[in-house]
């Protein structure tokens, strides 16, 4: 990768973001980090090679060789090794429960034997695996046993003193920690490699059931004497069988110590699963443990993310490399396995009603049609801007499911509503005529529980727009503080208390509701899904930080600046349902305000055409200019841009099929104070006005197209059913499963959807 040889402080080669320090040693620091491409948390052991002597350097590379060799569910996995001129970075699996020493210290008299048996059996299982590979650990102690609470496992770590051995041959290096080292190591004699690990296992078991080390005196000299004499006292509460096993392991003579086979077959360890981790396959020992479908989907995702091409990925896996390619592959693969196993556990333990709720609120761990992913990413090149992790994160919701909330919180990500489906468009209302009384437009989200409350207020709404979500795997809808209007929309099931905490929310808001579209709308949704497929990128909450970075740069190039992170470009401004095009765009390249001539302002006349008829006179795809002769109209245009951008963020598309030169401006200036929105003074948005017979298209910011050419084929059918969609002045639009209602009233003082009068505005509460 291009960034692989750049600086390693803060961000390792653009692959990992370093965070807080988890621990320190003589030559190394262990830091919490986040893998940028996948978002997974890892532990990074940073070793300063400038402080190492020749012997320590040898131990360092021996540790790396041994950790590459041992891959077991009860051993912390090594994902990647990054070697620089001055530092060595070991990318390791991150435990979530601390080490065993701290856990033991919380129990003065030790753990109950059933729990101690469970943990000790896992440690024995891991050491037995190492010895079968002729690897000796030589530094077994509770500090080097890490808890993985979510998996219910303990795992060995820190192979800094490990080494390969040959059966029958002795080792000579004295290493380890005093309180846990076998007598023969402390004496400096040659020793049998497996026997020293057996001694350390005895010390660990003693600590588990007694709460303190067997050999720990006031000073090292006294401790050494106790070890050499093998003097220790087992408390009376320890069972006879457990005491016998401890005695079998803590033997002064290595030849008299129990072997690992004898330990595994000891009566005290009977009836316990030696390794529950074998049920999880996490960490993934080999890519061959994955199905062909999972394997291919991960490779495809890495290729789309510019990690490497397919041949390079396969070659790295087959040769057991420990580079950024294999690290990314296994982090993605393990997430798939973890999500699948958690889902299986929830399915077995949950009631039918809970299962239904989980299905509604979760994402699938994989997909069966890789073509969906390709359509997803090619629809919006913004996902590929500058950083390699963006496309993989955008595909994350499709392949791996929703990320855990803890991850999202740690990254401090702001999520926007996920809308998987084609860009939205509107069908004009059947009738929209000016009125004389001063009224306000109410923008609200409806729910059945609060309809009665809404009815109590005498309001004459000239039209009502119902926006409907299309079914999708991304059915989580969360609030966003930075979007001034859209932050009133929140997820089904979210508490009202949390919702009320936002001080900037308007008083008249209610929750989302589920309802069924009219037959015409259902027919329309079917045709859109059949002809166009998915148009948005299905980016997940995981994409907010990195993807927003690239999008802000794109917005800057287009002449716009905002105080919030934008969503995918597919959620751009709108076109009409009838013509399939009609998307808003900046007024000019420099972001200045276009001014229309008086003849333009007065041309055409008349009221907006109805959804089923009308006589539009403008050319298909023509963008009309909205400006007035005074400074107040420029201010109104700027305010209109604020609201349009807010609507843009949730893929709310407002299109209009109007007569000749009818003006269509939205002005929220007098209704809400958008303190969080900052639009350049000369920036304005022009709404698209298209004829009913053609599929005019106007590019949005960045020039991205959201509608396929074949949308024009459905125009006739859509025109035929418009009268049904517009029945009772309700305009129904497909969103994704949920319904948003926009009630619009015209304010003659401000103007609303006015025909030939000065530029009109609508008021949003």
UniProtKB/Swiss-Prot annotation:
GO cellular component: nucleus
Enzyme class label: transferase
GO biological process: myeloid cell differentiation; protein phosphorylation
Positions bearing Omega-N-methylarginine: 534
Renumbered residue ranges of the record's region Disordered: 512-634
Gene Ontology molecular function terms on file: ATP binding; magnesium ion binding; protein serine kinase activity; protein serine/threonine kinase activity
Activity regulation field: Activated by phosphorylation on Thr-173.
PROSITE patterns: PROTEIN_KINASE_ATP (PS00107), PROTEIN_KINASE_DOM (PS50011), PROTEIN_KINASE_ST (PS00108), UBA (PS50030)
Function: May play a role in hematopoietic cell proliferation or differentiation. Potential mediator of neuronal apoptosis.
Family recorded in the similarity comment: Belongs to the protein kinase superfamily. CAMK Ser/Thr protein kinase family.
Protein name, as recorded: SNF-related serine/threonine-protein kinase
Origin organism lineage: Eukaryota, Metazoa, Chordata, Craniata, Vertebrata
Gene: SNRK
């Amino acid at each position: 990768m291009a960034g692989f040889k750049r600086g390693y402080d803060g961000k390792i080669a653009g692959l990992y973001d370093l965070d807080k320090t988890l621990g320190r040693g003589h030559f190394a620091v262990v830091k919490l980090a986040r893998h940028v491409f996948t978002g997974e948390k890892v532990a990074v052991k940073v070793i300063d090679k400038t402080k190492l002597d020749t012997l320590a350097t040898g131990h360092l590379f021996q540790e790396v060789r041994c950790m590459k060799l041992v891959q077991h569910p009860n051993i912390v996995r090594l994902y990647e090794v990054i070697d620089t001129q001055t530092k060595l970075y070991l990318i390791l699996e991150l435990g979530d429960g601390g080490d065993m020493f701290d856990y033991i210290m919380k129990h003065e008299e030790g753990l109950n034997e059933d729990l101690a048996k469970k943990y000790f059996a896992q440690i024995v299982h891991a050491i037995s695996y190492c010895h079968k590979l002729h690897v000796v650990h030589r530094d077994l102690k509770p500090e080097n046993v890490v808890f993985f609470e979510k998996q219910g496992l303990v795992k060995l770590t820190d192979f800094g003193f490990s080494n390969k051995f040959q059966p029958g041959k002795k080792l000579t290096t004295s290493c380890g920690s005093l309180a846990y080292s076998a007598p023969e190591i402390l004496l400096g004699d040659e020793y049998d490699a497996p026997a020293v690990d057996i001694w350390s296992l005895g010390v660990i078991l003693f600590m588990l059931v007694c709460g303190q080390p067997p050999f720990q005196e006031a000073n090292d000299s006294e401790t050494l004497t106790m070890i050499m004499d093998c003097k220790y006292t087992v408390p009376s509460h320890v069972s006879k069988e457990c005491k016998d096993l401890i005695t079998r392991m803590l033997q002064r003579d290595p030849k008299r110590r129990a072997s690992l086979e004898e330990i595994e077959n000891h009566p005290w360890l009977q009836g316990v699963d030696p390794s529950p981790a074998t049920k999880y396959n996490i960490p993934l020992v080999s890519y061959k443990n994955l199905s062909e479908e999972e394997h291919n989907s991960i490779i495809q995702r890495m290729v789309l993310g510019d990690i490497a091409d397919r041949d390079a990925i396969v070659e790295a896996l087959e040769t057991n490399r420990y580079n950024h390619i294999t690290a990314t592959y296994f982090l993605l693969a393990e997430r798939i396995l973890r999500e699948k196993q958690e889902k299986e556990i929830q399915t077995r333990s949950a009631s039918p009603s809970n299962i239904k709720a989980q299905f509604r609120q979760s994402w699938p761990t994989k997909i069966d049609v890789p073509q969906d992913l390709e359509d997803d990413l090619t629809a919006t090149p913004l996902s590929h801007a500058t950083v390699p992790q963006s496309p993989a994160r955008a595909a994350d919701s499709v392949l791996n499911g929703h990320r855990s909330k803890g991850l999202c919180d740690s990254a401090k990500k702001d999520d926007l509503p996920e809308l998987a489906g084609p860009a939205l468009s509107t069908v004009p209302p059947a009738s929209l005529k000016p009125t004389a009384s001063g009224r306000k437009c109410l923008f609200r989200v409806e729910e059945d529980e609060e309809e009665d409350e809404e009815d109590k207020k005498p309001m004459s709404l000239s039209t009502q727009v119902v926006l409907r979500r299309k079914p999708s795997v991304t059915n989580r809808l969360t609030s966003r503080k930075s979007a001034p209007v859209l932050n009133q929309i929140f997820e089904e099931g979210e508490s009202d208390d949390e919702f009320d905490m936002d001080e900037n929310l308007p008083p008249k808001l209610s929750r989302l509701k589920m309802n069924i579209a009219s037959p015409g709308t259902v027919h329309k949704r079917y045709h859109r899904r059949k002809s166009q497929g998915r148009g948005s990128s299905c980016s997940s909450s995981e994409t907010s930080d990195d993807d927003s970075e690239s999008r802000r740069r794109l917005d800057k190039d287009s002449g716009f600046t905002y105080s919030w992170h934008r969503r995918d470009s597919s959620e751009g401004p709108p076109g009409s349902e009838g013509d399939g095009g009609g998307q808003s765009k900046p007024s000019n390249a420099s972001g200045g305000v276009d001014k229309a001539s008086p003849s333009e302002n007065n041309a055409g006349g008349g009221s907006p055409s109805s959804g089923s008829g009308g006589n539009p006179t403008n050319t298909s795809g023509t963008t009309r200019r909205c400006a007035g002769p005074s400074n107040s109209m420029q201010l109104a245009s700027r305010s209109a841009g604020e609201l349009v951008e807010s609507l843009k963020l949730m893929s709310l598309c407002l299109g209009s099929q109007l007569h000749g030169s009818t003006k269509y401006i939205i002005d929220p200036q007098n209704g809400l104070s958008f303190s969080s929105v900052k639009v350049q003074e000369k920036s304005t948005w022009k709404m698209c006005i298209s004829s009913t017979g053609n599929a005019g298209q106007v590019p949005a910011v960045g020039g991205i197209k959201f509608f396929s050419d074949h949308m024009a084929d459905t125009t006739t059918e859509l025109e035929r059913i418009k009268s049904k969609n517009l029945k009772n002045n309700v305009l129904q639009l497909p969103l994704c499963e949920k319904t948003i209602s926009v009630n619009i009233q015209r304010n003659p003082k401000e103007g609303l959807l006015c025909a030939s009068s000065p530029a009109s505005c609508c008021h949003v509460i």
